[in-house]
């Protein structure tokens, strides 16, 4: 059988399975939905469902199902489906998600700005009607030691506490990733172009950071972060 025919069968069965499961009730794992003072909104989905259960929760166009089915990793497919489950939860109307050439997500049928992040266990989105956004989430079970050399400035390295280093590195990394997503630029040097001010590690807190453009123009940002269930999440609006 040719590869094209095989792929068509996989896509067909994927969509068919979604239709079969639609008659069953599945418990939704919306972990957090939070409206911020700046009128942005954050929603977090805990991925506890199977792939089949996630399919039952959502209504996805055939072309999007085809795109999701191309991912070989079940974890990646579940993350994509969980994003769509969040969109269904947050928006009253059906949203169509797409991506720019640089990978930045956008909603085809809505002017609302969106940023997306995910781990194996959690998927999160942040939305705002006008302002640019950035969000990133990471598991604290990951070893962030490599971040120190590749993404931190000398001043940031000096501010590290040996007893809390991995947590601090995770926050630094998430903050810089969130800013990177917000700026939507290619080839950003995290160590040289994004400077995060020293902070006191807490379960929830605020961060100050500076993005240095290649023409040396500086842009300042205020970020927020929270730690939950061995995960760190950092976001910014504006």
Region roles according to the model:
Residues 16, 20-238:
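Core catalytic alpha/beta fold that binds nucleotide/phospho-ligands
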Residues 2-5:
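Cysteine-centered motifs
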């Amino acid at each position: 059988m040719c590869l094209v025919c095989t792929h068509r069968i996989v896509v067909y069965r994927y969509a068919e399975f979604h239709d079969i499961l639609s008659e069953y009730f599945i418990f939704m794992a919306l972990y957090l939905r939070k409206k911020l003072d700046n009128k942005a909104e954050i929603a977090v989905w805990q991925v506890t469902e199977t792939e089949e259960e996630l399919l039952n929760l959502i209504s996805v166009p055939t072309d999007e199902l085809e795109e999701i089915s191309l991912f070989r990793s079940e974890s990646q497919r579940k993350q994509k489906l969980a994003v769509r489950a969040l969109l269904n939860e947050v928006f009253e109307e059906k949203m169509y998600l797409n991506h720019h050439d640089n990978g930045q997500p956008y909603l085809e049928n809505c002017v609302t700005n969106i940023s997306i992040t995910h781990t194996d266990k959690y998927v999160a989105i942040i939305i705002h009607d006008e302002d640019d956004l950035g969000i990133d989430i990471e598991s604290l079970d990951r070893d962030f030691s490599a971040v120190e050399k590749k993404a931190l400035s000398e001043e940031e390295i000096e501010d590290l506490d040996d007893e809390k280093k991995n947590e601090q590195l995770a926050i630094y990394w998430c903050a810089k990733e969130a800013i990177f997503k917000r700026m939507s630029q290619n080839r950003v040097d995290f160590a040289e172009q994004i400077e995060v001010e020293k902070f006191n590690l807490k379960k929830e807190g605020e961060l100050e950071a500076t993005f240095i453009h290649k023409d040396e123009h500086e842009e300042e940002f205020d970020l927020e972060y929270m730690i939950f269930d061995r995960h760190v999440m950092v976001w910014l609006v504006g």
